[in-house]
Design a protein with these regions (language model features):
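Generic secondary-structure signature for well-ordered alpha-helical cores
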Residues: 79-82, 148, 152, 205-210, ...
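Conserved active-site and cofactor/substrate-binding residues in soluble primary-metabolism enzymes
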Residues: 64-68, 72, 104, 138, ...
Length: 259
């Protein structure tokens, strides 16, 4: 199961999925002219020159349940130039990953978010320096308080890296909060959890307890502290911006599929 989870995260990071790795030197040429969205039984499809898109390697036809996701995918296909650069297609990559993984991965994806939550970023605090301690407390205590009140649970944050078990009732309640989510939503939640390092922030965003900006800011307290003291190079700026696009894509999927 761990290998399968690593594989799905690799899809999200690298682009085109297990069946076709993106060549970073020679990108595939664009092979289509027209991009469309069409309703079908069970949802919507993206068409390239009238043909339904498939996952890399042509293994699976792609149908999504809502028009908003299909439209976002179509826009990514439309904006490709002479060559197809999958790194500029976060929605296509995310949906490909979900479809390639299959429904059998739903329990594993749910468990991945819960595993992060049990040893969450918000629960392990710095001892020093005091400035960082204060920044963590301001952002993370607020988040934990909101979560605790909403779900009727308690958390046991700690300082340092020594493992601090969380109450079983808390973990059980968090598990219940993910119990009805579908494959596409859970794929997006796994992506968000990996990008933020926090299952708790992800669950809070799922239940509309936090805005995307609040989650992103809380997830980067430590990084922003370091930037404030040491600065940030261009590569780091580019990398963070790319991750924010991936995060926003996952947020869009969750919002589009929300009842």
């Amino acid at each position: 199961m761990r290998d399968q989870l690593d594989e799905i995260q690799k899809h999200l990071d690298d682009g085109y999925g297990r069946a076709q790795q993106l060549d970073k030197v020679e990108l595939p040429k664009r092979f289509y002219k027209d991009v469309g969205v069409a309703p079908v039984d069970g949802g919507f499809v993206v068409t390239l020159d009238g043909r339904q898109t498939r996952t890399p390697g042509h293994k699976h036809r792609i149908t999504v349940p809502v028009a908003a996701i299909a439209t976002a995918m179509a826009e990514e296909w439309s904006t490709q130039g002479e060559f197809i650069d999958a790194t500029t297609m976060p929605m296509v990559r995310l949906i490909n990953s979900a479809v390639e993984s299959g429904e059998e991965m739903v329990p594993a994806f749910r468990e991945e978010v819960l595993k992060f939550s049990a040893g969450d970023l918000l629960l392990y605090r710095a001892d020093t320096p005091q400035e960082l301690v204060g920044k963590q407390e301001a952002a993370w205590d607020y988040a934990l308080t909101v979560l605790a009140r909403h779900f009727g649970v308690s958390f046991q944050p700690t300082r340092g890296i020594i493992h601090q078990p969380q109450p079983k009732a808390t973990l059980d309640r968090l598990a219940e909060s993910l119990g009805d989510e579908n494959l596409l939503t859970l794929t997006a939640l796994v992506s968000m959890t990996g990008l933020t390092g926090s299952g708790l922030l992800t669950i809070g965003l799922l239940h509309q307890l936090f805005t995307p900006d609040q989650v992103w800011t809380a997830a980067h307290v430590d990084e922003d502290y370091q930037i404030g003291h040491w600065g940030q190079d261009e590569e780091a700026i580019h990398r963070r911006a790319k991750r924010r696009v991936e995060f926003d894509t996952a947020v869009m999927v969750v919002a589009a599929l929300r009842p």
